[in-house]
Design a protein with these regions (language model features):
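Transmembrane-helix motifs of polytopic, lipid-linked glycan transferases
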Residues: 56, 60-81, 120-123
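Perimembrane helix-loop-helix junctions
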Residues: 150-183
Length: 446
């Protein structure tokens, strides 16, 4: 569909040709993705897309990026020196943590970079690497403008914790990397979005704004002045269900902390997932949980570390906790993904249909302005003027459109398409069926 794989596949096509992040699908007009989110991190994927310019490349890249986090995780485990028997269990737990898989269910998103970069930054800090700490901080900030929250939460943790000791000289680098850099970067990002883009997505905090109010400062004011309301807004059924789904896979270990400073790592969970009014923020089927759950994973790891080193629990008990976490995680992961196999089988049994559909869509001239059904937009990503019939021009007629391409069944109201009325407008205004049409695909030409 257009959101999000249609948007990002069209964006990568433009990046492949002129290095811009311009899309027409994201806001129904030609607009750089930088006008919506500051995400230069995407350019790290571009070389691979240039070699293999397929939509599948983006999905494969996302999976590889997310699970590449196992590399810094191995280094962290070696550094904190957990009992050797626990190392393979911790690694196995990471692989079956539901969010690491389910968050990719709606294809590529820049947030996929959060797990490896958060863990690389954590490892750089406990290793007291100066230059690489700055590097991984910048890379983390380049994911998205709100990534500064993850950096600040790490900064607050390392400022008040007593688990790791740092040289006095390194502390200056720590404060520079984890406080000065993210605050300055966020301020710059907000300025650029306000001046040249769509502005910050404050609408996702509408539940924290009074009538007539707008802006992040108003959100902060209301949070400070109305803490009980904010606290109450967290205890909705869906949010509590979300909390269960992100904590239960770790046997609630993130909550078992002797060091209160560790709870700073939960800051993004509240600011990015629970406080927002956008329902997908607290749904593990979407990409907004990558960063928060990576920090929860670190909290679980730190919990095991303190329980082991302070001899508050025997190694056998901790091994049992990790084993149970793997079982819980695997069960939740299976419940969310077992039907994915059906979709693969569905494609394989109808491969001729999908191959024919792809051939039909590729035959549409690239220089035409195309209005398409959302499911067709990834295949039409090479078109510079590509729009989704579901929301283009508020579903009104647009005379600038050259070609309309939709499933043939969309013509019939009985099939339940909300776009049927829009399609009818184009037919009534003189758009005729093209000889490019097939029995499954209806193509109208001006």
């Amino acid at each position: 569909s257009s959101f999000d794989i249609g948007i990002f596949s069209q964006m990568f096509e433009r990046m492949r040709h002129d290095f811009s992040q311009v899309t027409t699908l994201e806001r129904d007009r030609a607009l750089s993705h930088f006008g919506v989110h500051i995400s230069p991190i995407y350019y790290l994927i571009l070389p691979f897309y240039m070699l293999f310019p397929y939509v599948e490349t983006l999905d494969i890249a996302q999976t590889v990026i997310v699970f590449s986090a196992v590399i810094p995780l191995c280094l962290i485990l070696k550094k904190i020196q957990l009992p050797k028997v626990m190392t393979p269990l911790v690694l196995a737990l990471f692989f079956v943590t539901p969010v690491m898989t389910t968050s990719g269910g709606f294809h590529l998103h820049e947030n996929c970079f959060l797990p490896p970069l958060i863990l690389w930054l954590f490892y750089s800090l406990i290793s007291q690497w100066r230059g690489r700490t700055i590097l991984f901080t910048l890379l983390l900030l380049f994911v998205k403008e709100d990534a500064f929250v993850y950096v600040l939460s790490l900064g607050l943790y390392f400022t008040f914790q007593h688990r790791f000791t740092f040289e006095a000289k390194f502390k200056k680098w720590l404060y520079l990397s984890l406080f000065a850099l993210p605050i300055l970067y966020f301020a710059l990002a907000m300025f650029l979005l306000a001046r040249y883009g769509e502005g910050a997505m404050v609408s996702r905090y509408n539940n924290l704004l009074l009538s007539g109010e707008n802006g992040l400062l108003m959100v902060v004011k209301n949070v400070v002045l109305n803490p009980l309301y904010v606290l109450g807004s967290l205890f909705t059924a869906k949010r509590l269900g979300y909390l269960f789904l992100v904590l239960f896979p770790f046997s609630f270990l993130p909550l078992i902390q002797r060091r209160w400073s560790t709870y700073f790592l939960m800051l993004p969970l509240f600011l990015i997932n629970l406080l927002m009014d956008w329902p997908y923020q607290y749904d593990i089927g979407f990409q907004y949980s990558y960063g928060s759950v990576t920090l929860l994973f670190l909290m679980a790891l730190l919990s095991i570390d303190q329980l082991s080193k302070n001899q508050l629990a025997s190694d056998n008990v901790l091994v049992a906790l990790l084993a149970s976490s793997i079982i819980f995680s695997s069960a939740i992961l299976y419940s969310f993904t077992h039907n994915w196999n059906f979709e693969i089988q569905y494609y394989q049994t109808r491969k001729d249909y999908f191959d024919g559909l792809e051939k039909t869509l590729q035959a549409i001239p690239k220089d035409k302005a195309v209005l398409a059904a959302g499911g067709y937009t990834p295949s039409l990503r090479s078109h510079e003027k590509l729009y989704d019939i579901f929301y283009h021009n508020n579903k009104k007629l647009d005379s600038k459109i050259d070609i309309v391409v939709v499933p043939r069944e969309m013509q019939e109201e009985k099939n339940g398409y909300s776009e049927t009325a829009t399609l009818k407008l184009y037919k009534e205004s003189g758009y005729k069926e093209s000889n490019l049409s097939t029995k499954d695909v209806l193509i109208l030409e001006k």
